[in-house]
């Protein structure tokens, strides 16, 4: 059962002093001012458990601020203002800190200095998630005293963790065409055909009638997700950010990175993913032993396949489509891929069948649009095949 403590950042220094916890391990203490900005990291208690970005940045206050703000809902979330108004929070960071920045990605949380809370009492892995639908859709069903991991979910689209019979799942909506949820499902099916390590996605209809994507949790009470941005800060000074990233992974003894990363870049090339930033891929780590297990499964592929184009331009050159994170265009980024990936001969036929089956469920996807998507995707698949053939 959750212990509810009212959030108050107006009680002087003591109320603004927090312990950054890693499960039940105190990591450091820090003072936050009335804007919830870290002004001083006062003590490093367990340096081995510091967030990884604090190990690659010299300024510990800036690094910790980055870490805390990453766990808050971004300003680009379309319903953020509605959430802040409903929960009487001044900004996203305050909203996140009310639930101690508990989340379902990593095992860090912020504990008020005089609190007797512990991980076993409040973590979201061992206790039911009870929350308002407002995170996902319009709703008047709100309990502002709930401790929720949903106030610490990074991402621009409306989304929330829910407790299902199948376990904990992330539900995520789309934008004006609502194409992203369908893209998530299609791309995860592609990954299965390609034998890429990935998170499986399904479509789900919520109470409002809206169709969203649904995927299982890929962390656990023992395994946490560390996004790639934690080690990306030094990469900005390097011409070859791809190799610099691999070097950083070697430095931190993260295994089996290149093959998985190459598969991710090939998939992004194929699907024209413009959203593979350093938060959308990363690593799995045992939070007790601090051992890295490898790359996290491929996830978050909604911003693909012309998701943001009301009308697809068949004459737009493929080399103009943007990419992340190592190069600004896919045609340049794909050149980093040297792993001999194999594409099944049957994939073209299978992909066409999957597109017919999946996108037919979206009333915004007209027959003409689907035909254009299939034609362009088939062309893109031929281009990827041609590139990979040269590697053999």
State the predicted function of each range.
Residues 273, 278:
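Catalytic-loop of the protein kinase fold
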């Amino acid at each position: 059962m959750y212990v509810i403590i009212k959030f108050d950042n107006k009680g002087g220094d003591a109320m603004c002093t927090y312990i950054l916890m890693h499960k039940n391990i105190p990591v450091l203490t820090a003072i936050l001012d009335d804007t919830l900005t870290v002004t001083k990291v006062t003590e490093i208690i367990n340096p081995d458990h510091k967030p990884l970005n604090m190990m690659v940045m010299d300024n510990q206050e800036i690094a910790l601020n980055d870490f805390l703000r990453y766990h808050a809902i971004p300003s680009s979330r379309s319903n953020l203002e509605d959430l802040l108004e409903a929960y009487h929070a001044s900004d996203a960071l305050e909203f996140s800190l009310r639930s101690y920045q508990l989340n379902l990605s990593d095992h860090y949380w912020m504990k008020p200095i005089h609190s007797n809370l512990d991980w076993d009492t409040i973590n979201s892995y061992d206790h039911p998630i009870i929350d308002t639908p407002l995170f996902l859709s319009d709703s008047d069903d709100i309990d502002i005293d709930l401790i929720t991991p949903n106030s610490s979910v990074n991402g621009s689209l409306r989304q929330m963790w829910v407790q299902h019979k199948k376990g904990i799942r992330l539900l995520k909506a789309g934008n004006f065409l609502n194409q992203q949820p369908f893209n998530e499902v299609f791309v995860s099916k592609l990954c299965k055909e390609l034998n890429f390590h990935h998170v499986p996605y399904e479509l789900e209809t919520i109470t409002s009638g809206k169709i969203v994507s649904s995927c299982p949790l890929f962390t656990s009470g023992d395994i946490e997700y560390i996004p790639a941005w934690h080690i990306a800060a030094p990469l900005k000074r390097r011409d070859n950010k791809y190799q610099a990233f691999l070097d950083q992974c070697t430095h931190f003894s993260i295994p089996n990175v290149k093959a998985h990363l190459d598969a991710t870049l090939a998939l992004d090339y194929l699907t024209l993913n413009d959203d593979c930033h350093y938060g959308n891929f990363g690593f799995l780590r045992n939070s007790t032993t601090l051992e890295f297990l490898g790359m996290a499964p491929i996830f978050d592929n909604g911003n693909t396949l012309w998701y943001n184009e009301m009308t697809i331009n068949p004459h737009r050159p493929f080399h103009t489509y943007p990419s992340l994170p190592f190069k600004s265009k896919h045609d340049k980024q794909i050149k980093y891929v040297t792993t001999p990936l194999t594409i099944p001969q049957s994939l073209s036929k299978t992909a066409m069948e999957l597109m017919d089956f999946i996108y037919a469920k979206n009333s915004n996807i007209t027959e003409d649009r689907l035909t254009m998507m299939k034609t362009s995707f088939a062309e893109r698949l031929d281009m990827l095949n041609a590139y990979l053939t040269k590697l053999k």
